[in-house]
């Protein structure tokens, strides 16, 4: 997704791949865009701490 298409207050699907104990895993979660910064954007999810994604992570991991 292009950072220029982000809208503050809107929810986006964050799709991420990671490795846990040597096993590749995929996870998805809905994040709300709180603010857009020069280097990326800040998102929140329910009661979790704010999540910062850089421009590359936004391009590769976010979906509408």
Task: State the predicted function of each range.
Residues 1-7:
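Mixed-charge, Lys/Arg-rich low-complexity intrinsically disordered regions
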Residues 7-8, 37:
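Ala/Thr-enriched low-complexity intrinsically disordered regions
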Residues 17-21:
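Short, charged beta-turn/beta-strand-edge "cap" motif at the junction between a beta-strand
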Residues 23-51:
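Basic/aromatic-rich interaction segments and small domains that mediate binding to polyanionic partners
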Residues 46-64:
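Intrinsically disordered, low-complexity, charged/polar segments
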């Amino acid at each position: 997704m292009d950072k220029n298409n982000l809208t503050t207050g809107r929810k986006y699907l964050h799709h991420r791949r990671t490795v846990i104990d040597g096993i590749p895993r995929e996870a998805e979660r809905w994040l709300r865009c709180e603010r857009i910064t020069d280097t990326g954007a800040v998102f929140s999810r329910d009661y979790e701490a704010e999540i910062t994604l850089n421009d590359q992570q936004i391009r590769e991991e976010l979906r509408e």
